Each structure stands twice: as C-alpha cells, then as structure tokens.
C-alpha cells in the first residue's frame, strides 16, 4: 500500500492514509489514456458546422439555357456546383463527434492518470475543506497552504457547496465532486487536491 500524508487546511500534516495500489499505483497505460482524452475532447466539439448544398442554395429553378444548339455544356440550374454561387459538394453538415470507449478501458485510463499523479508527487490529500461561507480569498489561501497555487483540480464531497462556490472566481482552479472526476481534467491539472472522504469513494468505485 502506498502511503501519503493527509494535510489540514493550514498545510500541516494531520495523519497518513494508505492508498489502494490497484487504483493509485498501477503502471500507467499511455495508449488507453490517449484514447480516453480523445474521446472526451471529441465529445466537447459542437459540430455545428454547415454549408449549403445545391438543394439549399436559393435560386436556380429555371434552366439557364436550352439543352441543345448553343454549343455550351448542358446545364439544368445555375446553382450546380460548377457555377459561381452554386452549392457545395460534400461539404460539412451538422453532426455529433461523440463516441464511447469501453467502460473498463476508461476506468483503466482513470486509474493510470491517478497513479501518474501519485508517482509525480502531484496528489495532495486534505482531511477536509470546510468554509463557513463561500469566500474566494479563503479558498485561495488554503490552496497556497497546500502548495497548489498553479492549475489545480479539487475533488470534494457531494454536499460541499461552499467550496464549490468559493472557487468559481479562480481562473486556474476547477472544483468537482467525486462522481465528476474524469481523465481529461486530471491530465490537464498540475496539482490534484482530493478530500480524504473522496479518496475512499474513488477507491470504492475503481478498485
């Protein structure tokens, strides 16, 4: 079992916690991590691109010249693709780029990135994040105490609304509940701060 320090909000050590090696100490699988990141990024694409094909372009209802006798190539509409102002051939249309990878593969990717954070000493476990009221400065001070003043992902309990509201104004801080933890956000974060109770919940879901 891998042991890490559990810190208080002031940065002092409160205790130690044993992490499940099946979740936080596996050999990272870079190929699966890549698959998971690409899947999430594809799902974020809006896919609202669109152009007009010959059926959507206005005009062109009349045959521009007679079929035979002019010496020109036959044409049925001035909105055919070869004409200026005509429709686009095989242009992009609105679509969803979302796709899914297997659940076990995604779980392996999540365990891989969590293990990588532990190996890189970028995981901070805090005993609790409790605030009397939502206040950005208080939250910022706690992150400074935890040496997490760069791009930080904070994972909290479901009911920790004060912590979630306190971090909304901080540009480089993202707060989410345990159920929302995902590969892309963990990869993008420089530091990963997790409340101790959330560690147990993550291990219960992935072990």
From Swiss-Prot:
GO molecular function: rRNA binding; structural constituent of ribosome
Gene Ontology terms: cellular component: ribonucleoprotein complex; ribosome
Region feature Disordered, mapped onto this chain: 49-75
Alphabetized UniProt keyword annotations: Ribonucleoprotein, Ribosomal protein, RNA-binding, rRNA-binding
SUPFAM superfamilies named among the record's database cross-references: Ribosomal protein L4 (SSF52166)
Gene Ontology process terms (BP): translation
Keyword Ribosomal protein: yes
Recorded superkingdom: Bacteria
UniProt xrefs under NCBIfam families: rplD_bact (TIGR03953)
Subunit structure: Part of the 50S ribosomal subunit.
Matches recorded under HAMAP family: Ribosomal_uL4_B (MF_01328_B)
Similarity field: Belongs to the universal ribosomal protein uL4 family.
PANTHER family referenced in this protein's UniProt entry, alphabetically: 50S RIBOSOMAL PROTEIN L4, LARGE RIBOSOMAL SUBUNIT PROTEIN UL4M
Biological function: One of the primary rRNA binding proteins, this protein initially binds near the 5'-end of the 23S rRNA. It is important during the early stages of 50S assembly. It makes multiple contacts with different domains of the 23S rRNA in the assembled 50S subunit and ribosome.
Protein name (database record): Large ribosomal subunit protein uL4
Species of the source: Leuconostoc mesenteroides subsp. mesenteroides (strain ATCC 8293 / DSM 20343 / BCRC 11652 / CCM 1803 / JCM 6124 / NCDO 523 / NBRC 100496 / NCIMB 8023 / NCTC 12954 / NRRL B-1118 / 37Y)
Source species taxonomy: Bacteria, Bacillati, Bacillota, Bacilli, Lactobacillales
